[in-house]
Amino acid sequence: MNLRVFKKDIEFFVGEFIDDCALFAALNPHKDADEISQIIDEAVDLYNDLKNKANHPEGNKKAFYTALTKEMFEKIDTLCEKLSAVVSK
């Protein structure tokens, strides 16, 4: 995996999650907008953190990017669980 493709993956996956949050907030104005806003802020922080880490690899690049990819999916999954909790209220 090269760096350019990885950065595009970060933009796609985090961007899609933010789009899902915004769509839910638009379709459900009666739900708690503050919680959705907080989840979006966490997603933006994740995006910035992943981009920063991708630009400054440490050690073996292949192992580093593999671990960073795993971290990205784990954190996005955690954010999805938070969004699901808000949706189910």
What are these regions (language model features)?
Residues M1-K31:
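N-terminal acidic leader/helix
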